[in-house]
Amino acid sequence: AFEPSTNNLRTLSRNIYLNDLTEKVIISQIALSDKKNKYLTMRESNFIEGSAESAFGVDTDYEGNKFITKNKYKILGNTINDLLGNEILEIPNYIKIDVDGVEHLVLRGANKFLKDKRIKSISVELNEVLKEQYNEVLKVMKDSNFRFIDKKSCKSVGSEKYLNLYNYIFEKN
Protein backbone atom coordinates (compact mmCIF):
# COMPACT_ATOMS: atom_id res chain seq x y z
CA ALA A 1 0.00 0.00 0.00
CA PHE A 2 1.34 3.42 -0.95
CA GLU A 3 0.13 6.20 1.32
CA PRO A 4 1.93 9.53 1.25
CA SER A 5 -0.78 11.42 3.15
CA THR A 6 0.03 12.09 6.79
CA ASN A 7 -3.74 12.26 7.39
CA ASN A 8 -4.27 8.71 6.15
CA LEU A 9 -1.17 6.80 7.19
CA ARG A 10 -2.29 6.23 10.78
CA THR A 11 -5.74 5.02 9.68
CA LEU A 12 -4.21 2.66 7.12
CA SER A 13 -1.72 1.17 9.58
CA ARG A 14 -4.42 0.69 12.22
CA ASN A 15 -6.73 -1.06 9.72
CA ILE A 16 -3.93 -3.36 8.59
CA TYR A 17 -3.24 -4.30 12.21
CA LEU A 18 -6.91 -4.74 13.19
CA ASN A 19 -7.49 -6.99 10.17
CA ASP A 20 -4.43 -9.12 11.02
CA LEU A 21 -2.70 -8.24 7.74
CA THR A 22 0.67 -7.07 9.06
CA GLU A 23 2.45 -10.00 7.41
CA LYS A 24 0.67 -9.50 4.08
CA VAL A 25 0.58 -5.72 3.55
CA ILE A 26 3.61 -3.45 3.28
CA ILE A 27 3.15 0.30 3.68
CA SER A 28 5.33 2.62 1.62
CA GLN A 29 5.00 6.25 2.63
CA ILE A 30 5.85 7.55 -0.81
CA ALA A 31 3.68 8.88 -3.60
CA LEU A 32 3.39 7.18 -6.96
CA SER A 33 3.94 9.36 -10.00
CA ASP A 34 5.50 9.52 -13.45
CA LYS A 35 8.65 11.08 -11.94
CA LYS A 36 11.46 8.88 -10.63
CA ASN A 37 12.80 9.53 -7.10
CA LYS A 38 11.67 13.13 -6.90
CA TYR A 39 10.56 15.20 -3.91
CA LEU A 40 7.40 17.09 -4.83
CA THR A 41 4.72 18.94 -2.91
CA MET A 42 1.94 16.98 -1.24
CA ARG A 43 -1.18 19.09 -0.70
CA GLU A 44 -3.98 18.19 1.70
CA SER A 45 -7.39 19.81 1.93
CA ASN A 46 -7.77 19.38 5.71
CA PHE A 47 -6.31 17.83 8.88
CA ILE A 48 -8.86 15.03 9.22
CA GLU A 49 -7.54 11.51 9.75
CA GLY A 50 -8.61 9.17 6.96
CA SER A 51 -9.81 11.98 4.73
CA ALA A 52 -9.78 12.23 0.96
CA GLU A 53 -8.78 15.06 -1.36
CA SER A 54 -5.04 15.43 -1.57
CA ALA A 55 -2.73 16.17 -4.50
CA PHE A 56 0.86 15.13 -5.16
CA GLY A 57 3.03 17.09 -7.57
CA VAL A 58 0.14 19.14 -8.98
CA ASP A 59 -1.82 22.14 -7.76
CA THR A 60 -5.22 20.97 -9.00
CA ASP A 61 -7.86 18.87 -7.27
CA TYR A 62 -9.78 15.81 -8.47
CA GLU A 63 -12.09 18.08 -10.50
CA GLY A 64 -9.25 19.98 -12.20
CA ASN A 65 -9.79 23.11 -10.09
CA LYS A 66 -7.09 24.98 -8.17
CA PHE A 67 -6.37 22.96 -5.03
CA ILE A 68 -7.38 24.71 -1.81
CA THR A 69 -4.49 23.78 0.46
CA LYS A 70 -4.77 23.54 4.25
CA ASN A 71 -1.52 21.60 4.65
CA LYS A 72 1.44 20.96 2.38
CA TYR A 73 4.87 19.39 2.59
CA LYS A 74 7.50 17.81 0.36
CA ILE A 75 7.53 14.03 0.11
CA LEU A 76 9.32 11.50 -2.05
CA GLY A 77 7.56 10.21 -5.13
CA ASN A 78 8.60 7.42 -7.44
CA THR A 79 7.40 5.41 -10.41
CA ILE A 80 6.04 1.89 -10.39
CA ASN A 81 8.57 1.22 -13.17
CA ASP A 82 11.45 2.06 -10.83
CA LEU A 83 10.09 0.12 -7.86
CA LEU A 84 9.42 -3.02 -9.91
CA GLY A 85 12.46 -2.65 -12.18
CA ASN A 86 14.82 -2.51 -9.21
CA GLU A 87 12.97 -5.43 -7.59
CA ILE A 88 12.03 -3.34 -4.57
CA LEU A 89 8.56 -4.84 -4.96
CA GLU A 90 7.15 -7.91 -6.64
CA ILE A 91 4.72 -7.49 -9.53
CA PRO A 92 1.23 -7.56 -8.00
CA ASN A 93 -1.79 -9.46 -9.29
CA TYR A 94 -4.26 -6.69 -8.43
CA ILE A 95 -3.83 -2.92 -8.40
CA LYS A 96 -6.13 -0.18 -7.07
CA ILE A 97 -5.30 3.40 -8.08
CA ASP A 98 -7.18 6.20 -6.32
CA VAL A 99 -5.01 9.30 -6.20
CA ASP A 100 -7.46 12.17 -6.59
CA GLY A 101 -6.92 13.17 -10.19
CA VAL A 102 -3.40 12.04 -11.05
CA GLU A 103 -4.19 8.41 -11.90
CA HIS A 104 -2.95 9.01 -15.45
CA LEU A 105 0.47 10.03 -14.08
CA VAL A 106 0.73 6.87 -11.97
CA LEU A 107 -0.09 4.76 -15.04
CA ARG A 108 2.50 6.66 -17.12
CA GLY A 109 5.06 5.72 -14.50
CA ALA A 110 4.01 2.06 -14.76
CA ASN A 111 4.04 1.66 -18.55
CA LYS A 112 6.90 -0.86 -18.66
CA PHE A 113 5.06 -3.37 -16.48
CA LEU A 114 1.38 -3.00 -17.32
CA LYS A 115 1.54 -5.69 -20.02
CA ASP A 116 2.92 -8.25 -17.56
CA LYS A 117 0.55 -11.24 -17.37
CA ARG A 118 0.86 -11.43 -13.57
CA ILE A 119 -1.26 -8.29 -13.32
CA LYS A 120 -4.79 -9.66 -13.58
CA SER A 121 -6.94 -6.65 -12.74
CA ILE A 122 -6.63 -2.91 -12.16
CA SER A 123 -9.19 -0.61 -10.58
CA VAL A 124 -8.73 3.08 -11.42
CA GLU A 125 -10.73 5.99 -10.02
CA LEU A 126 -11.63 8.33 -12.88
CA ASN A 127 -13.36 11.67 -13.16
CA GLU A 128 -15.28 11.46 -16.42
CA VAL A 129 -15.32 15.27 -16.75
CA LEU A 130 -11.52 15.46 -17.03
CA LYS A 131 -11.58 14.19 -20.62
CA GLU A 132 -7.85 14.38 -21.35
CA GLN A 133 -6.93 12.33 -18.28
CA TYR A 134 -9.90 10.01 -18.76
CA ASN A 135 -9.00 9.30 -22.39
CA GLU A 136 -5.32 8.80 -21.54
CA VAL A 137 -6.18 6.19 -18.90
CA LEU A 138 -8.52 4.32 -21.25
CA LYS A 139 -5.85 4.30 -23.98
CA VAL A 140 -3.11 3.11 -21.63
CA MET A 141 -5.33 0.31 -20.36
CA LYS A 142 -6.29 -0.80 -23.87
CA ASP A 143 -2.68 -0.61 -25.10
CA SER A 144 -1.65 -2.74 -22.09
CA ASN A 145 -4.13 -5.50 -23.00
CA PHE A 146 -6.78 -4.67 -20.41
CA ARG A 147 -10.48 -4.61 -21.12
CA PHE A 148 -13.11 -2.58 -19.32
CA ILE A 149 -15.35 -4.73 -17.10
CA ASP A 150 -17.45 -2.38 -14.96
CA LYS A 151 -17.60 0.96 -13.20
CA LYS A 152 -18.91 1.81 -9.75
CA SER A 153 -20.07 5.25 -8.67
CA CYS A 154 -18.12 7.12 -6.00
CA LYS A 155 -21.05 9.44 -5.29
CA SER A 156 -21.69 9.92 -1.60
CA VAL A 157 -25.15 8.89 -0.47
CA GLY A 158 -27.39 11.97 -0.27
CA SER A 159 -24.74 14.23 -1.81
CA GLU A 160 -23.83 15.57 -5.22
CA LYS A 161 -20.15 15.41 -4.29
CA TYR A 162 -18.08 13.03 -6.40
CA LEU A 163 -20.93 12.84 -8.92
CA ASN A 164 -18.54 12.35 -11.88
CA LEU A 165 -16.14 9.97 -10.11
CA TYR A 166 -16.20 6.26 -10.84
CA ASN A 167 -14.02 3.29 -10.00
CA TYR A 168 -13.32 1.67 -13.36
CA ILE A 169 -12.46 -2.02 -13.25
CA PHE A 170 -10.23 -3.50 -15.94
CA GLU A 171 -9.19 -7.13 -16.47
CA LYS A 172 -6.31 -8.50 -18.48
CA ASN A 173 -7.42 -9.89 -21.87
Language model: regions and residue ranges:
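Phosphate/nucleotide-binding beta-alpha loop and adjacent structural elements of enzyme active sites
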Residues: A1-N173
